[in-house]
Amino acid sequence: MTASAKPSSRHHRIRSLEVTGGFLQGIKMDFSDGLNCVIGGRGTGKTTVLEALRFALDRMPSETVDRRRHEALEKLLQANLGTGSVKLELETADGILYSVSRAFGETPLVTNADGKPVDIRIGNDMHFGVDIYSQNQIEDIANSDYFQQSHLKAWSDE
């Protein structure tokens, strides 16, 4: 990894996801600049991949807003990650590369291209924003005027 790469687009992107340990042991997925879809049969780890992304980026549902969903996802991650970890490679719109690593029960560790820890926050208020939707969430949005309007408002405020 170099200190900076030529930006391939004018937006931030997730370059790859790698899992060490657990159900997805050894998986490495490279992502394209645009829309990425995870497709596979029942029980192949699609939900686990999606939730691993959400977990590494510290974008889990709020425990105070949706406690039941938060706890269900924590159980899923603990069962599927075990003592393993998730690592993401991120590229900013300016072509700067970062890695984010996270194990269950820990906070995300962000490092620069040289592997040195940097003081960048991951999560809802970080400059590297991301929207991640499960199939059920997409169905909820499609079936609810309220969800559609709230998402459109949130996107228009950006």
Regions found by a protein language model. Name each.
Residues 1-43:
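Charged catalytic cores and adjacent phosphate/nucleic-acid-binding surfaces used
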Residues 10, 31, 42, 46, ...:
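Active-site-proximal structural scaffolding
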Residues 20, 32, 38-41, 52, ...:
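Generic beta-strand/beta-sheet core signal
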Residues 22-24, 70-73:
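Active-site-adjacent structural elements in folded domains
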Residues 116-158:
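Extended, charged alpha-helical "arm/stalk" segments used for dimerization and assembly
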Residues 26-27, 39-40, 46-48, 98-99, ...:
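Short helix/loop capping segments that flank catalytic or ligand/cofactor-binding pockets
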Residues 35-71:
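Phosphate-binding glycine-rich loops of NTP-binding sites
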Residues 76-132:
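Nucleotide-state sensing region of NTPase/ATPase domains
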